[in-house]
């Protein structure tokens, strides 16, 4: 499954919607996504499982890439 993770780049500042970024992670569950990203230096706001149609749409963006550690 592919998950879209919305995050802020810093742990020390209050989250601001305009600074929210996203990345895509392949994992078995939302819990696994959070475990994979727990040591990263950013604040996870939301993790969303995306549908096949949503994934196809996101892949049209030339900047689309799955996160790799």
UniProtKB/Swiss-Prot annotation:
UniProt-listed Pfam families: RpoY
GO cellular component: DNA-directed RNA polymerase complex
Keyword set, alphabetical order: DNA-directed RNA polymerase, Nucleotidyltransferase, Transcription, Transferase
Enzyme class: transferase
Catalytic activity: RNA(n) + a ribonucleoside 5'-triphosphate = RNA(n+1) + diphosphate
InterPro entries for the chain: RpoY (IPR009907)
GO terms (BP aspect): DNA-templated transcription
TM helices/strands, residue ranges: none
Oligomeric and partner information: RNAP is composed of a core of 2 alpha, a beta and a beta' subunit. The core is associated with a delta subunit, and at least one of epsilon or omega. When a sigma factor is associated with the core the holoenzyme is formed, which can initiate transcription.
Function: A non-essential component of RNA polymerase (RNAP).
Protein name (database record): DNA-directed RNA polymerase subunit epsilon
Record organism: Listeria monocytogenes serovar 1/2a (strain ATCC BAA-679 / EGD-e)
The organism's taxonomic lineage, starting at the top: Bacteria, Bacillati, Bacillota, Bacilli, Bacillales
Gene: rpoY
């Amino acid at each position: 499954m592919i998950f879209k993770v919305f995050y802020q780049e810093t742990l020390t500042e209050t989250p601001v919607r305009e600074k929210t970024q996203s990345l895509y992670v392949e994992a078995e569950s939302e819990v696994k996504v959070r475990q994979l990203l727990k040591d990263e230096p950013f604040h996870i706001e939301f993790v969303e499982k995306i549908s096949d149609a949503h994934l196809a749409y996101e892949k049209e963006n030339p900047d689309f890439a799955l996160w790799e550690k």
